Amino acid sequence: MFHQIWAALLYFYGIILNSIYQCPEHSQLTTLGVDGKEFPEVHLGQWYFIAGAAPTKEELATFDPVDNIVFNMAAGSAPMQLHLRATIRMKDGLCVPRKWIYHLTEGSTDLRTEGRPDMKTELFSSSCPGGIMLNETGQGYQRFLLYNRSPHPPEKCVEEFKSLTSCLDSKAFLLTPRNQEACELSNN
């Protein structure tokens, strides 16, 4: 009898605790514009990589040697395409250029990376002004990435990202140092 009462109390305690400390919901962005053919222009342009979160630190290891990353997202030359250019400033000062092509998936919020059929990217809004969050999944990894229009967003933005991703089972967190000047983005 004691065990049943104890189990019932723990059960109700769990319900109350869960209702008080629910993770905040994040609203998913659509990858298609109002006309169903284009990526929303508000998400095009320059972005800075601020932070990452993942279930394990190994899923973020690719960012360990990075000081900062600046991206430019532009509409592609073909419909349903996005061109992403980046310049990565490594902690040793080197600048490493990168390019990707995302393919929009009609009727879905997924972005698919050209040449990486296993990789799926989903976009989410951020409560932080000028912010956006990505969820990247691929073979053997899942990570959340925080981007902002400013290289130094308010600390509150990073804390909210960390809190949200910890609710989503991310145990590892990485904040880019952003101590060095960002590398210049090339136009090609």
From Swiss-Prot:
GO terms for cellular component: discoidal high-density lipoprotein particle; extracellular region; high-density lipoprotein particle; low-density lipoprotein particle; spherical high-density lipoprotein particle; very-low-density lipoprotein particle. Tetradecanoate binds at E136, R143. The keyword Protein biosynthesis does not apply. Its main location: secreted. The keyword Kinase does not apply. GO terms for biological process: cholesterol efflux; cholesterol homeostasis; high-density lipoprotein particle assembly; high-density lipoprotein particle clearance; high-density lipoprotein particle remodeling; lipoprotein metabolic process; negative regulation of plasma lipoprotein oxidation; reverse cholesterol transport. Plasma protein. Expressed in liver and kidney. It is found in: Secreted. Pfam families: ApoM. Disulfide bonds join C23-C167, C95-C183, C128-C157. Glycans are attached at N135. Interacts with LRP2; LRP2 mediates APOM renal uptake and subsequent lysosomal degradation. Probably involved in lipid transport. Can bind sphingosine-1-phosphate, myristic acid, palmitic acid and stearic acid, retinol, all-trans-retinoic acid and 9-cis-retinoic acid. This is Apolipoprotein M. It comes from Homo sapiens (Human). The lineage of its organism: Eukaryota, Metazoa, Chordata, Craniata, Vertebrata.
